[in-house]
Amino acid sequence: MDYQRLLFLFAVAMVITTTVALPQDTALMDGQLQKRGTPCKCLGYTGVYWFMITRCPNGHGYNLSCPYFLGVCCVKK
């Protein structure tokens, strides 16, 4: 019984610590967070490497793509 209570208190303390430690950034909350990818080369152009997908994602303005190691390199020309 004591171990269960101790484990419960430890879990509550971890949740409180994690909640307090998270940044309260307004840009993060407004959805303005910008994701950055790894640069890659595609037909002489520098693009963004997307891991574990076969096509460039829609809505990002990519108009050139090359297959890359376990993913795709997407370029905005």
Swiss-Prot record:
InterPro entries registered for this protein in UniProt: BDS_K_chnl_tox, Myo_ane_neurotoxin_sf
Domain of life: Eukaryota
Protein keywords: Acetylcholine receptor inhibiting toxin, Cleavage on pair of basic residues, Disulfide bond, Ion channel impairing toxin, Nematocyst, Neurotoxin, Postsynaptic neurotoxin, Proton-gated sodium channel impairing toxin, Secreted, Signal, Toxin
GO MF annotation list: sodium channel inhibitor activity; toxin activity
Pfam family, one: Defensin_4
Residues in the signal sequence: 1-21
Other observations noted: A synonymy between H.magnifica and R.crispa is controversial.
Family to which the UniProt record says this protein belongs: Belongs to the sea anemone type 3 (BDS) potassium channel toxin family.
Protein name: Pi-stichotoxin-Hmg5a
Lineage: Eukaryota, Metazoa, Cnidaria, Anthozoa, Hexacorallia
